[in-house]
Amino acid sequence: MNALYIIDLIGFFGPHILFLITLYLLYSRKHYLFVYIFACVLNGIINLILKGIIRQKRPDGDTDIFNKNKKYERIGSNNFGMPSGHSQYVVFSTIYIYLVLNNTNITLFYALVSLITMFQRIKYQNHFLKQVIVGALLGGSLAYCSYLFANKKIMGKLVSKKDDNALDTI
């Protein structure tokens, strides 16, 4: 296997890679994890609904990543490419993990996988550039809204209490 093919595979499986890593990273932050999983499902539903409404075709090439001499066979709603689900998922995961963890190294890794994924979708003619950009914008927007929701729910549970001076009675 050559290095370029491995990069292509990273791009193809980018959403899955980031999803699994995010589950691991958010395991100790259950509330953020729950919101992330729920928002991932919502992200997929939004993607399918928009593809059904917009009905914009994919490029004609649409190469199969596992056999470059063959055109990828698509059925049903998978024939439509607007917005790109891959870019929607990877940017969603990248923005969400950045907002929750605020860790530069993790964010850079996520951004790299996201860029590889978006490039791979265009390289293999699975999507037009516009479809990838719209998917990324949708994913980023949903990540931001999900983070605001999760953060509000967590902060809403913090209630300041008057000190009961329990230690003074001992």
Set out the residue ranges of the language-model regions.
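A cytosolic-side transmembrane-helix exit/cap motif
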Residues: 52-63, 127-135, 152-160
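Hydrophobic alpha-helical bundle signature of multipass membrane enzymes
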Residues: 1-82, 88-123
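Alpha-helical transmembrane segments that form the membrane-embedded catalytic/substrate-binding core
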Residues: 86-90, 127-151
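C-terminal membrane module of polytopic membrane proteins
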Residues: 141-170
